[in-house]
A protein has these predicted regions:
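Cysteine-nucleophile amide-bond enzymes
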Residues: 1-234
Length: 234
């Protein structure tokens, strides 16, 4: 039943506006500011799904960019016999590579929506009413490992039970959590999980709350990148 309700209300929008606050011109500016591995957050007003989500921010994803941008940003990261990231992705993650080769979509994100873990154009998360981007304060090598972890989840189904302890299905902020999870060979991000309905949960809003709580701390794990809303673009 929970899955049926979630699918039924996804995309239901009661706004009278045809266009979102973030315009195509804004997105062109946003593209210039983003770097691979950035964490993106969005909100649309008057969407029915907002009622069931805690806090202001309702969705999150990870910015990939394009093959050229990946190669340029991670050009100093050794990848065995592969000369660049795009070559490595072609060998290890061929489905990801094929999707990124579709130049008509420009730049890409990886996110979890109703069909599951997908690679979509940047517009899917940026052409909205409110958009923000945060940059993990991590070495490039660890950001690349986080992206590779996300790529490994491509095609997994959506987790309608919002159970962060399962790995075979994911929800949007769970992709962020597990992609940037610390391991023996990877520095990562630390998130405080919140208990909801007997489960541990990380919501998109929790990510922003973490950024806000740590903003003036020497141990802050995010840099601010960009924020757009109806009144202010900064």
């Amino acid at each position: 039943f929970q899955k049926w309700v979630a699918i039924s209300i996804t995309g239901v929008d009661y706004s009278s506006r045809k266009e979102k606050y973030v315009s195509n011109e804004d997105i062109n500016i946003i593209k210039e500011e983003l770097l691979p591995g950035d964490i993106l957050l969005k909100r649309n007003n008057y969407q029915l799904t907002n009622m069931g989500l805690p806090g202001f921010w309702t969705h999150t994803g990870i910015y990939i960019g394009c093959l050229e941008k990946l190669d340029k940003y991670f050009n100093d990261i050794p990848l065995g016999d592969c000369l660049c990231v795009s070559e490595y992705v072609k060998v290890i993650y061929p489905k990801v590579y094929d999707r990124l080769c579709n130049e008509s979509d420009g730049e890409y994100i990886i996110e979890v929506i109703a069909p599951g873990v997908v690679i979509n154009s940047l517009d899917a998360i940026a052409k909205v009413d409110y958009f923000s981007a945060l940059r993990p304060k991590l070495p490039k090598e660890d950001k690349l490992k986080a992206l590779f972890t996300a790529f490994e989840s491509l095609g997994k189904a959506y987790d309608y039970n919002f159970d962060i302890m399962t790995d075979n299905v994911l929800f949007c902020s769970e992709l962020i959590y597990k992609s940037y999870l610390c391991s023996r060979n990877k520095k990562g991000l630390t998130f405080d999980l919140e208990a909801k309905a007997g489960r541990l949960l990380l919501s998109p809003n929790n990510i922003i709350k973490k950024f806000d709580a740590e903003f003036y701390s020497e141990n802050s794990e995010f840099d601010f990148v960009i924020f757009y809303d109806e009144d202010r673009k900064s």
